[in-house]
Amino acid sequence: MGKVAVAFAAVAVVAACSVAAVMVGRRMKSRRKWRTVVEILKELEDDCDTPVGRLRQVVDAMAVEMHAGLASEGGSKLKMLLTFVDDLPTGREKGTYYALHLGGTYFRILRVLLGDQRSYLDVQDVERHPIPSHLMNSTSEVLFNFLAFSLERFIEKEENGSDSQGVRRELAFTFSFPVKHTSISSGVLIKWTKGFEISEMVGQDIAECLQGALNRRGLDMHVAALVNDTVGALSLGYYHDPDTVVAVVFGTGSNACYLERTDAIIKCQGLLTTSGSMVVNMEWGNFWSSHLPRTSYDIDLDAESSNANDMGFEKMISGMYLGDIVRRVILRMSEDSDIFGPISPVLSEPYVLRTNSVSAIHEDDTPELQEVARILKDIGVSDVPLKVRKLVVKICDVVTRRAGRLAAAGIAGILKKIGRDGSGGITSGRSRSEIQMQKRTVVAVEGGLYMNYTMFREYMEEALVEILGEEVSQYVVVKAMEDGSSIGSALLVASLQS
């Protein structure tokens, strides 16, 4: 019996050792997998790093590209388009005006009532609708017939039995895509962005397309202005505060415009305006510089997009793309380890993770990160532990921090070009005394990314102070302009009628 007992004991010891070895092996394997994802995160942090020195290099590059774009057509990746807006609303406008805004995700219709004092601005009957996805690759006729029909329904609700037939309505068409203007009320489409792909429209006059659709429906409505969304935001900002000289949109896409002296627009020598200035639409989404911190995820996203090698800056800072950058990081971690469980087919779908979900993940303050868990479940990643949820929050933070800080560098680049960054910048003939006298400068900002994503907004504003320094940044005011592009465009039409 003694020998049997010894044998059993030996077997038990061997079994225990085997179990222990398996457990140790599993722990080591788990640690290796965790170490793998930590290394991926560290690589992402390094590649997205935006120290203030690097940001100032981006600022300088932006200012140089602006100068080149004003000097000659095709001289820069920045198109620096003339808008033919040389007078902005003063607050003395009055009347009733309409605006239709076609953006990247939504279209809006609104009516604005103006008194003859700046304090009387009544925005009525705002309608906001998602753009049906089938319209984005339909035809010119289908798209504009849909917009005209939407305007017709809006007018019918407004009339509601009232006798307003025979009244011609003045309409501002806010169009968030690159247009080469021939006047304030006409311009041809240069290219589509933000996922639209109606190739037959490139080179067509956008205002004429809409006016034709309105005429076909028998609507007595006149397209009085064709306005980029940034120009609309600048218009509303200037209406409230004449120190507004820059406007930026951070939404599905991103763009900026600013008030430039006509003598600095070298490619249009002899351009005369009563104000001596004109609003320039930069189309800054296509800006590029070797100083931009690009990752392998950015490269893959660009290569697989419908506009490869185009809109490089926009793809790093705008709402259409931030979610997909985060998705690509999570997918790589899933492929290199199993901390997210089996790879979900949903996770492999481009753009399945939206930037509004990234915002919700980033700003989840529940102890167990319940919102993070819910959103991960929606993309096929279920039952991950808290430390993995925290990892996802960190990914969102890294990607968003880079976006916000690069956005700030873009704004600072504009301020440098017009001599409002404290350095004098590319001054285009300004005297030394003008350079040294720092002026109050208002930057109007609009767009869902800025308005709704708190951390993006905070990172952008924090970086702007870092770049400019405390002394100069106290003269720079960033103002949110909700629905500014639509309201401001209506104000521009009003100023034309005054």
Curated annotation (Swiss-Prot):
A Gene Ontology molecular function term of the record: D-glucose binding
Locations listed in the record: Mitochondrion outer membrane
UniProt-annotated binding residues for ADP: G104, T105, T252, G448
Phenotype of null mutants: Dwarf plants with reduced roots and leaves growth. Reduced sensitivity of seedlings to glucose repression of development.
A GO BP entry: intracellular glucose homeostasis
Hexokinase domain ranges (all copies): 35-494
Keyword annotations: ATP-binding, Glycolysis, Kinase, Membrane, Mitochondrion, Mitochondrion outer membrane, Nucleotide-binding, Transferase, Transmembrane, Transmembrane helix
Membrane topology: Single-pass membrane protein
Pathway terms, separated by semicolons: Carbohydrate metabolism; hexose metabolism; Carbohydrate degradation; glycolysis; D-glyceraldehyde 3-phosphate and glycerone phosphate from D-glucose: step 1/4
Region (Hexokinase large subdomain): 228-483
Sites where the protein binds D-glucose: T193, K194, N228, D229, N255, E283, E314
Its biological purpose: Fructose and glucose phosphorylating enzyme. May be involved in the phosphorylation of glucose during the export from mitochondrion to cytosol. Plays a role in plant growth and development, perhaps by mediating cross-talk between glucose and hormone response pathways. Involved in root hair cell development by mediating certain aspects of cross talk between glucose and ethylene response pathways.
Protein name according to UniProt: Hexokinase-3
Organism: Arabidopsis thaliana (Mouse-ear cress)
